[in-house]
């Protein structure tokens, strides 16, 4: 059986990237929550 995680940076950024987060209201909320929490990385 093959592993489920096959790393791919392009797919990672397309699905979980900063620009994708900024597109929707809830995505922006995610970024703001992570900023408030003091996360070093806000998104993929």
Curated annotation (Swiss-Prot):
Annotated PANTHER family: LARGE RIBOSOMAL SUBUNIT PROTEIN BL34M, MITOCHONDRIAL RIBOSOMAL PROTEIN 34 FAMILY MEMBER
Q: Does the keyword Ribonucleoprotein apply?
A: yes
Pfam families the UniProt entry points to: Ribosomal_L34 (PF00468)
Name a single GO biological process. Answer: translation
Question: What keywords appear on the UniProt entry?
Answer: Ribonucleoprotein, Ribosomal protein
NCBIfam families linked to this entry: rpmH_bact
The text of the family note is: Belongs to the bacterial ribosomal protein bL34 family.
> Taxonomic lineage of this organism?
Bacteria, Bacillati, Actinomycetota, Actinomycetes, Bifidobacteriales
* Domain of life the protein comes from: Bacteria
Q: What is this protein called?
A: Large ribosomal subunit protein bL34
Gene3D superfamilies reported in the protein's UniProt record: 1.10.287.3980
State the organism of origin: Bifidobacterium longum (strain NCC 2705)
Q: Name one GO cellular component term.
A: ribosome
Molecular function in Gene Ontology: structural constituent of ribosome
């Amino acid at each position: 059986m093959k592993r489920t995680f096959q790393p791919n940076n392009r797919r990672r950024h397309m699905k979980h990237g900063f620009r994708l987060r900024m597109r929707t209201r809830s995505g922006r909320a995610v970024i703001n929550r992570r900023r408030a929490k003091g996360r070093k990385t806000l998104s993929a």
